[in-house]
């Protein structure tokens, strides 16, 4: 959940229209509630993607907080209204459909957080092999889409190798990154949905 705090913040800002500081506070309280309330145990990749699970629970958490706020303003004191969460089997019904919805802002932030987590996995492996400079150079071609015509020669010279060798390393790095990305999201989706989720994340990233 630490990794996905920013996507939660983005959803609170764009979907629920919270000001900056209120969104930060709400994101923190939501994550604490999710963890300490034991709700994470309800997340089951076989029944839906964790991305959808998290956004669904956030929407209902916000609705619950607003009901409590309204009750206090009405003078009825603090009351507890349980969040009416969707059943575990129909979470897919809340998947965003409109390409321009605030939910897409959440998905974009989710994608970037997931890519960062995958890059951190890969960076750690390169660090163990004393190859951080190579990591920084190679990730530019895979993640930042450097223009090959302008960059291969200078990058190869920087690493002290020829362009053919650099292209081979870029290709291997791309495969390793895809594997790191798959490993990052595997606990959050069913095996049957893994390829679809990977494709969706790449589409979000490339927009």
Each language-model region and where it sits:
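Intrinsic, short, N-terminal disordered tails of RNA polymerase sigma-factor systems
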Residues: 1-207
């Amino acid at each position: 959940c630490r990794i996905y705090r920013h996507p939660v913040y983005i959803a609170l800002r764009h979907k629920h229209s919270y000001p900056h500081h209120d969104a930060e506070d709400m994101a923190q309280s939501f994550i604490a509630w999710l963890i300490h309330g034991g709700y994470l145990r309800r997340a089951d990749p076989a029944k839906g993607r964790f991305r959808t699970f998290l956004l669904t629970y956030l929407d209902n958490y916000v609705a619950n907080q607003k009901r409590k706020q309204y009750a206090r303003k009405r003078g009825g004191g603090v009351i507890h209204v349980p969040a009416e969460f969707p059943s575990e089997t129909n979470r897919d019904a809340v998947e965003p459909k409109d390409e321009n919805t605030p939910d897409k802002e959440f998905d974009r932030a989710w994608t970037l957080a997931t890519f960062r987590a995958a890059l951190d996995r890969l960076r750690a492996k390169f660090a163990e092999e004393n190859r951080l400079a190579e990591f920084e150079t190679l990730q530019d071609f895979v993640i930042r889409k450097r223009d090959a015509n302008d960059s291969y020669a200078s990058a190869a010279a920087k690493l002290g190798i020829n362009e053919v060798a650099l292209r081979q390393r870029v290709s291997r790095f791309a495969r390793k990154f895809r594997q790191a990305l798959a490993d990052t999201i595997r606990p959050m989706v069913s095996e049957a949905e893994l390829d679809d989720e990977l494709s969706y994340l790449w589409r979000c990233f490339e927009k």
